[in-house]
């Protein structure tokens, strides 16, 4: 774990859990991944921790809790930003992020200390990327996989089919643990992926069953039926994923 330093942003909430995780990779040639929200104290902490060794900024996706700090840090340190733009519209888009380097699936970012492989994982967002630290078999997952919570897949940019496909895609990589965008490091990656896929498919089957059994068409009522195992105060969030299941 010497190559990885985690800094958690002070933005706890229903969507973000304990806060957004920012990662510094390397010892001398540092890569900053997901600088997080544009919060001054968080940006200051990142710059202090980087000790003038940050050479590039990578973003897993451009939601407002992951990328807004990229531009101010890039300007201060005079380093390039790497990532992708969304394919269309997004409900939570950070409009300040425009990558200097556009990343594509299977791209490699090589330094003398480590190699990062880019894995395009659309689903949570069309431009979502994961980054595999080859020397550690550690996957920086962003919001593709989170600790302690399932991922919200919401319209218009989210796509449940793409999300399942992107989860299955990870089986071909050698991964020993996850460094998620929210929460703690996660071991047993294969079992974690299998569990998420089972959960999503089970939820989809439940949607079909509830639609057939109830005949209900009201979105709020259907969400309550499908997510009756989830605390009611989270139904407003669950509704985003339900919209995609309902219309798929």
Residue ranges of model-derived segments:
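Conserved beta-strand hairpin/beta-sheet module of binuclear metal-dependent hydrolase folds
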Residues: 1-51, 130-142, 147
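Metallo-beta-lactamase
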Residues: 30-32, 37-38, 115-122, 126-206, ...
């Amino acid at each position: 774990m010497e190559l990885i330093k985690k800094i958690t942003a002070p933005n706890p909430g229903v969507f973000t859990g304990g806060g957004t995780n920012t990662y510094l990779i390397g010892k001398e040639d540092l890569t900053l991944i997901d600088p997080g929200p544009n919060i001054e104290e968080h940006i200051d902490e990142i710059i202090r921790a980087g000790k003038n060794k940050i050479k590039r900024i990578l973003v897993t996706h451009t939601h407002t809790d992951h990328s807004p700090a990229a531009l101010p840090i890039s300007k201060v340190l005079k380093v390039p930003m790497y990532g992708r733009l969304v394919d269309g519209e997004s409900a939570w888009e950070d409009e300040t992020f425009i990558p200097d380097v556009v990343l594509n699936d299977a791209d490699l970012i090589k330094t003398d200390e480590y190699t990062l492989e880019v894995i395009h994982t659309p689903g949570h967002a069309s431009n979502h990327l994961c980054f595999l630290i080859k020397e550690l078999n550690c996957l920086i997952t962003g919001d593709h996989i989170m600790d302690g919570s399932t991922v919200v897949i919401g319209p218009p940019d989210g796509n449940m089919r793409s999300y399942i496909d992107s989860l299955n895609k990870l089986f071909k990589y050698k991964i020993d643990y996850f460094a998620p965008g929210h929460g703690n490091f996660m071991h047993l990656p294969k079992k974690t992926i299998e569990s998420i896929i089972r959960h999503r498919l089970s939820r989809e089957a439940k949607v079909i069953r509830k639609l057939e059994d109830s005949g209900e068409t009201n979105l709020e009522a259907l969400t309550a039926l499908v997510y009756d195992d989830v605390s009611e105060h989270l139904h407003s969030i669950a509704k985003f994923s339900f919209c995609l299941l309902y219309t798929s």
